[in-house]
């Protein structure tokens, strides 16, 4: 009789106790359908090991184990000639994947804790926002937002500082300047003529454009990955590009440049990839929203996938409660992993090597979720 314990692995996809439970469930199924078959204990251990080798996360492991248990019941425990379990990944149904995706949807409390605007925020009365002093998000100086288009000096670092273990100090990634430096570049390696601000409260954001709750936008259940690019304008922080990708087919449903309401200060080309906006061609925000907030695209039944989606939904002025955020699914200690690092870690894929591309980012976040569930990234038929 084989020892009923999981095979040791260098990288465990799930805790020991969880793997033991799966082995016992497999054994129970085999004993039910093939009670006279020899060495069922060994087969249970072997088949669990096959599942573990295919899984890169606890959630993916549990999903793959559920498929194995389903197949044992479906095929009455019949074995192939080698006595091995061959995972039928292409046979995973759309309904099963949809159920697994729903298990990844974040609760309203988690959404609120991570900066998402929720229905509760919209219900609570907010104090009237008054125009006046704002803090520049780049140089951190106070300025009068009514003078935002008046040329001034804004000196800042393009990228945040990061701890350098070798130097044992914080260092700016954009220029290598040390955080405690007293040189002229200590305040920043770049200088522009305007301060910029970013409204963060529900009241401040609603003042420019009202939020719309997807509840009431009827439509069939769909799964969409999305990513936005933003620019700084005289009105704050606005949408300038939106990409929406369909989960099941990898089809790009929407990829448009969108006109901001305010006068453009900085398109953030280094990060947005947007070089110019032709107002004669680009859709206005309202024109774009008529398309992306609709029964055929983002509706009350949509599951939305993205990385740090609170920023995207804020500029889209959407309140939605079915969110899968890869930044929250894969925490990095007290911090959140960047999509660039996450794509390399989970997919061995390098992204954002040049200017950002919202379609590349949307697909990367979507593929991270597919990888988590053990779904082939190239599968397009269901």
UniProtKB/Swiss-Prot annotation:
Enzyme Commission no: 3.1.-.-
Cellular component GO terms, alphabetical: cytoplasm; nucleus
Domain Exonuclease: 223-369
UniProt superkingdom: Eukaryota
A molecular function (GO) term: nucleic acid binding
Swiss-Prot/TrEMBL GO biological process terms: exonucleolytic trimming to generate mature 3'-end of 5.8S rRNA from tricistronic rRNA transcript (SSU-rRNA, 5.8S rRNA, LSU-rRNA); regulatory ncRNA 3'-end processing; rRNA 3'-end processing; U5 snRNA 3'-end processing
Enzyme class: hydrolase
Major localization class: cytoplasm
Location(s) in or outside the cell: Cytoplasm; Nucleus
Keywords: Cytoplasm, Exonuclease, Hydrolase, Nuclease, Nucleus, rRNA processing
Function of the molecule: 3' to 5' exoribonuclease required for proper 3' end maturation of MRP RNA and of the U5L snRNA.
Protein family: Belongs to the REXO1/REXO3 family.
Protein name: RNA exonuclease 3
Organism lineage: Eukaryota, Fungi, Dikarya, Ascomycota, Saccharomycotina
């Amino acid at each position: 009789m084989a020892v009923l314990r999981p095979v040791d692995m260098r990288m465990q996809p799930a805790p020991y106790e969880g793997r033991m439970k799966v082995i016992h469930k497999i054994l129970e199924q085999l004993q039910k359908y093939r009670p006279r078959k020899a060495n069922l204990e060994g087969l249970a251990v072997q088949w669990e090991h096959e599942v573990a080798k295919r899984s890169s996360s606890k959630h993916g492991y549990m999903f793959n184990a559920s498929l194995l248990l389903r197949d044992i019941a479906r095929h009455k425990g019949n074995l192939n000639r080698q006595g091995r379990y061959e995972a039928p990944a292409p046979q995973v149904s759309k309904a099963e994947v949809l159920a697994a995706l729903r298990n990844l949807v974040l609760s309203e409390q988690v959404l609120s804790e991570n900066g998402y605007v929720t229905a509760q925020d919209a219900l609570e009365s907010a104090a009237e926002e008054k125009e006046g002093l704002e803090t520049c998000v780049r140089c951190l100086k106070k300025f009068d937002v009514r003078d935002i288009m008046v040329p001034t000096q804004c000196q800042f670092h393009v990228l945040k500082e990061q701890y350098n273990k070798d130097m044992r100090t914080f260092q700016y990634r954009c220029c290598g300047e040390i955080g405690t430096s007293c040189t002229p570049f200590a305040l920043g390696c770049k200088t522009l003529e305007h301060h910029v601000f970013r409204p963060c409260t529900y009241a401040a954001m609603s003042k420019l454009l009202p939020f719309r709750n997807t509840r009431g936008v009827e439509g069939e259940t769909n799964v969409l990955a999305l990513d936005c690019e933003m620019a700084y304008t005289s009105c704050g922080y606005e949408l300038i590009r939106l990409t929406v990708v369909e989960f099941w087919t990898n089809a790009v449903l929407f990829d448009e440049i969108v006109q901001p309401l305010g006068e453009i200060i900085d398109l953030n080309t280094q990060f947005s990839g947007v070089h110019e906006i032709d107002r004669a061609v680009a859709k206005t925000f309202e024109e774009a929203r008529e398309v992306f907030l609709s029964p055929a695209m983002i509706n009350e039944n949509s599951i939305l996938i993205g990385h740090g989606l609170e920023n995207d939904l804020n500029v889209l002025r959407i309140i939605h409660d079915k969110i899968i955020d890869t930044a929250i699914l894969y925490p990095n200690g007290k911090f959140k992993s960047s999509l660039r690092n996450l794509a390399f870690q989970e997919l061995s894929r390098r992204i954002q090597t040049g200017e950002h591309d919202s379609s590349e980012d949307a697909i990367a976040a979507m593929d991270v979720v597919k990888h988590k569930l053990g779904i082939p990234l190239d599968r397009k038929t269901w």
